[in-house]
Amino acid sequence: MYKFDPKLNHSAAHVLAMALTKFYPNLSLAIGPAIDEGFYYDFNLNDPNTSITPIDLLKIEKEMKKIAAQALTFDYEQVSYEQAKDLFKNNKYKLDIIEENKNKPLSIYHSGKWFDLCKGPHVENTKEIKAIKLLNIAGSYWRGDANNDQLIRIYGVAFNDQAQLDAYLVDLQERKERDHRKIGKDLNLFTFNNLAGQGLPIWLPNGTIIKSQVQKFINEVEFQFNFDTVITPILGSIDLYKTSGHWDHYKDNIFSPVQIDNEVLILRPMTCPHHTLVYSNELRSYRSLPIRLSEHSILHRYESSGGLTGFERVREMILEDCHVFCRPDQIEHEVINAFKMIQEAQEGLGIKTFEIHLSLNDPNDKEKYYDDPQMWEHSQNALRKMLKDHKIPYKEMVGEAAFYGPKIDFQVKTVLNRIITVSTIQLDFLLPNRFNLSYINENNEQSTPVMIHIGIIGTYERLLAILLEQTKGVLPLWLSPVQVVIIPVNENLHADYAKELNAKLRKHLVRSSLDLRNERLSKKIREAQIQKIPYQIVVGDEEIKNDKMVTYRRYGSEETTTVSVDDFIKVLENDIRSKK
């Protein structure tokens, strides 16, 4: 086991800066904080002809260990604004920080002759840093702004004993093996190509099969819960998003508009404005509510290039999106209905909710949130009461609401110990008003419906990333792109039966494949294991002679089983039905 000590890692960041200063005396140090897992330091070498390579990390790490062994203390000194400016007069990054904090206390920490602008805290001396590892080099921008200087960032970790570092490095290797980007590449599920554009995923045939199977399952869940499927345009008039409020509150995440003829259009970042148009397409009565709509839609949202991460953060995504239009007295029933729908979907996908967040607005942030205190109080209290009444444990998260209303977020803890929002239920009193939605109530008067946004699985891209990392790519049979591989012992003697068997399995909608390559049997079996194919069938003389039986082996098992073809198909059907 290991535990990160922020104070220790902050001190290790200073040790890294000391080592860097020795090897690169002309550099400008920027910032070096402790982070959730370790530390980093950002800096500018101030020399376009000099770079730092992974090999350089070894010598820097070696120097860090020498410095740590010297038991240098971390001595605090408070300085004035003028003193700080003088001490760091040749470092524009430190001067920027000093200027930002000129009306606050400023301090530096000394370690021997070296010092840095820092608030602390730190350990007593460097000898407490018993184990150090520099992990990688990355790029960053000063203040995280692409318009500012590009800096070099070195990440590292520090512990107070070697055993913790060793345990962490083992865990880190496991994470690399579970990284959905690596698994996706190994299993030919998806790819990216800069010629297509950054952050624009290309679903390969194997990945498309997984996506199709998930969508088929989710469509069935939506059908069971009485949702009607619609299809709306991938483009929308800018006026649509101005009416909804997205243009005012979400503009930075929307791709630039394009003018076509006399219209200004944008690639849609979400479907909710379109679904209000479906609702308003006909006159609604209180008796016809709730209206439940679903769509699996392609959306486009701008992400900075530095924020793009495999399938987790992309610029084009496929979102499973549901919207309910209901009467106020139906809110509780519809929210609970959404809860049940999400739970059923997560159970089928093997996903378990870690905790539930009630995401609220920040009343002080008038720019991010629609300014209607009464609406926020009403909607947030409605969700809060519902969660309490049904004894559903939750955490309140201020500042995490959508701009138009509060939401219930279903948080999933991945095997990599990351907390990710997969499913969501959002209560919205704003959009129905902005689009003048109405229904005829029991008094034959117009009333405004409530809109509930429901995301059962979120985006398919993020869901696939989670599934790959949870399963290490060993997907259940119903999701596996290739469910069975048929391998003849001899391509000449056994190919005909292998083809006949393949045709029969495919007739039963089993995703089987033939491996008729002129390769060693052991190599074919090994490659089937690498591809994580759930079932392998080896066809030889015995299978053909013995009433055309099949001998199969499950992925990860050395044990083989011989059964009739019909019985094997029953095994597959049972696994698929139970979503094993």
From Swiss-Prot:
Requisite cofactors: Zn(2+)
EC nos: 6.1.1.3
Alphabetical list of Gene3D superfamilies matching this protein: 3.30.54.20, Anticodon-binding domain, Bira Bifunctional Protein, Domain 2, Threonyl-trna Synthetase, Chain A, domain 2
Superkingdom, taxonomy of origin: Bacteria
Annotated spans, Catalytic: 179-476
Gene Ontology CC: one annotated term: cytoplasm
GO BP annotations listed: threonyl-tRNA aminoacylation
Keywords: Aminoacyl-tRNA synthetase, ATP-binding, Cytoplasm, Ligase, Metal-binding, Nucleotide-binding, Protein biosynthesis, RNA-binding, tRNA-binding, Zinc
Cofactor: record remark: Binds 1 zinc ion per subunit.
Major enzyme class: ligase
Compartment(s) where it occurs, according to its Swiss-Prot or TrEMBL record: Cytoplasm
Ligand binding (Zn(2+)): C272, H323, H453
Molecular function as annotated in GO: ATP binding; metal ion binding; threonine-tRNA ligase activity; tRNA binding
Entry-linked SMART domains: tRNA_SAD
Keyword Heme: no
Catalytic activity: tRNA(Thr) + L-threonine + ATP = L-threonyl-tRNA(Thr) + AMP + diphosphate + H(+)
CDD domains xrefs: ThrRS_anticodon, ThrRS_core
Family: Belongs to the class-II aminoacyl-tRNA synthetase family.
Subunit structure: Homodimer.
HAMAP family: Thr_tRNA_synth (MF_00184)
Name this polypeptide is given: Threonine--tRNA ligase
Organism listed in the record: Ureaplasma urealyticum serovar 10 (strain ATCC 33699 / Western)
Lineage per the UniProt record: Bacteria, Bacillati, Mycoplasmatota, Mycoplasmoidales, Mycoplasmoidaceae
Gene expressing this chain: thrS
